[in-house]
Every structure is written in C-alpha cells, then in structure tokens.
C-alpha cells in the first residue's frame, strides 16, 4: 500500500556512474555493483547453504562484473533495466520519501527525481529533505518524523481517515540556518519567484588546466580540507575558474536543483570537469554530523531500549564557506 524510501537509490547507473565516469559513493572508491552484490549476499553466512550455491553464485557475479562494463562507464540496456524511474508507470503504492541534502553516498538527486516521477503521475507522494547525510531520522529531535509516519501508516495500512494527505505537507525541507525550521511547500522546487544571479568572473581567462599537481593536494596525507579551501577561496589558479555573484542584499532561498551549462574544448583525449555552488561569508554553519542532546529520551515501547534524541552539530568557529 505504501513505501518509505529513506536515502534510497532510484537509478543504479546514477549511483555508480556519471556521464560515462566511474563515480562510486564518497569513501567507497573502487566499489561497483558486483562488489555490493557480494557484500549483501547473506547466504554466505551459512556455510552449508552457501556450499550448495557457491558455483552458481560465482558465475552470477562474473556476469554482473561483465555487464556493468566498468571500462567504458557507458549507460546500457543492462543499466536501463536497473533504472526504477523507467518503471514509474508501474508504481501502485503511495510514497513517503526521506533524504539528506548532505548525503554523498546516495545523492539527493535520487530522491528528487523519484518525487518528480511520482508527482507527474498523480501518485500520492510526500518528500522530506533534512540537512544530514546518509542516515535515518527517527531520532532527529524536532523533526516530528515519527508522528507523521504514524499518521501516514495508519491511513495507508489501516484505512483510517485521519487527513494524512492534508495534514502532512507535500514537501518539507529543513532549513540550513535553523534546524528547528522546516519549510513546507506543495511541490518541489517551491516556486515563489525567481531571480537569476549575475555571475562575474573572478579572473578574465577562461582557460584551466586539469592538473592535480598544480593544487595543494598531497596523496601522502589527509589534506582534503586544505585542498577544498584553496579551490574555493584562492582567487586565481590554473586548475579552476571562479565566478561570483554580487553580494546578496536580502535573505535568499535556493529551492530546487541548480543547473550549470557551459561549452568547453579539450586538448586531451579525456578530462574531468565538475562545478559546485558555494556560499561565501563568515558564518557558524550547520554540519551533517550529529550529537546526542537527550540520552534515553525516546521511549519506543514496552520491553525495548530507550533511544537518544539527536541534533545536527553547529560549527564552533565561523567558517569562510
């Protein structure tokens, strides 16, 4: 009757690839679908059972490794069969989506694309976007997630006419400025007006060099934060181009997915181009890391351990971006 995808994948190609590039989840370099299939194969935990399927399972894994075509990274019929968005017309259940805007494992596009597919087909659907990463939010203080979930399940599983469709907003987005504030809208993006920012190049040249050695990145130590700070804050470097807007005079909310269009010529046979949107300015920002604020504050029911209420941690010192 209903499904509740939390940090869920809607297109397996988009999880492991990006426009022909191998792009696994952050922290999982080298991962691919055959490795995940092996990792999740619970029958290997039972030696007697596993022995009965070992050869067939090994052949099946070899087939996945060949079909995923890691060498080319191309989208294929095999990947197309694992794109749930292509099967949206066959969805029958209502959907309650939950995803973290800072999820670098399963990126938020998986959630947003599935919501759009459901919405366009008139399938009852809700979407809740929080400021965390690849997590569950049943213990996120102030989210009221458990209350809404009970309301939703009572309606769809028990047929109770409790006004769940009207009482739960179609879209809830947690503010990155105040984690107790959830912005509600009937759809996504929340359209209340649009102003296109004017981009001003921080340097005149439109040429860049794809050369990691030109950066401060050091393979021998963990200095990713230093590399990112140089990339964002340094005004001129050969390996990147920066474009900045005029200072924002009023509070501005970006709703939806930012799109970047450009034309580029490349002197090499291959190259990696990426873009990111950055907020500049000294501020103590919300982080995706969580901290316990009330130990044992969640009673789950009789004879069950108490849960801890958590919140997202605020930076102790202002950051530049």
Task: Give the role of each language-model region.
Residues 75, 132-142:
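Active-site rim elements
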Residues 118-135:
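Catalytic histidine neighborhood in serine/cysteine hydrolases
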């Amino acid at each position: 009757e209903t499904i509740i995808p939390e940090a869920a994948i809607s297109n397996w190609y988009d999880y492991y690839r990006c426009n022909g590039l191998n792009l696994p989840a952050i922290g999982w370099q080298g991962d691919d679908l055959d490795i995940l299939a092996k990792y999740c194969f619970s029958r290997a935990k039972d030696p007697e059972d596993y022995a009965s399927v070992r050869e067939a399972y090994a052949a099946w894994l070899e087939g996945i490794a060949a079909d995923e075509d890691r060498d080319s990274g191309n989208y294929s019929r095999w990947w197309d069969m694992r794109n749930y968005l292509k099967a949206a017309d066959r969805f029958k259940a209502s959907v309650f989506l939950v995803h973290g805007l800072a999820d670098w494992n399963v990126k938020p596009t998986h959630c947003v694309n599935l919501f759009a597919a459901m919405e366009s087909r008139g399938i009852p659907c809700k979407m809740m976007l929080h400021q965390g990463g690849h997590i569950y939010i049943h213990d996120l203080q102030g989210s009221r997630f458990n209350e809404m979930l009970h309301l939703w399940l009572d309606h769809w599983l028990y047929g109770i006419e409790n006004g769940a469709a009207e009482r739960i907003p179609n879209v809830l987005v947690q503010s990155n400025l105040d984690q107790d504030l959830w912005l509600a809208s009937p759809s996504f993006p929340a359209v209340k007006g649009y102003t296109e920012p004017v981009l001003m190049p921080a340097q005149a040249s439109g040429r860049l060099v794809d050369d990691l050695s030109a950066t401060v990145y050091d393979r021998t130590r963990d200095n990713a934060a230093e590399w990112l700070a140089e990339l964002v804050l340094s005004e001129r470097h050969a390996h990147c181009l920066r474009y900045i807007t005029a200072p924002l005079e009023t509070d501005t909310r970006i709703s939806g997915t930012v799109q970047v269009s450009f034309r580029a010529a490349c002197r090499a046979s291959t190259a990696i181009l990426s873009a990111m949107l950055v907020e500049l300015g000294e501020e103590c920002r919300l982080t995706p890391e969580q901290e316990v604020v009330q130990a044992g504050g969640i009673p789950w029911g009789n004879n069950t351990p108490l849960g801890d209420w958590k919140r997202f941690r605020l930076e102790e010192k202002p950051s530049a971006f």
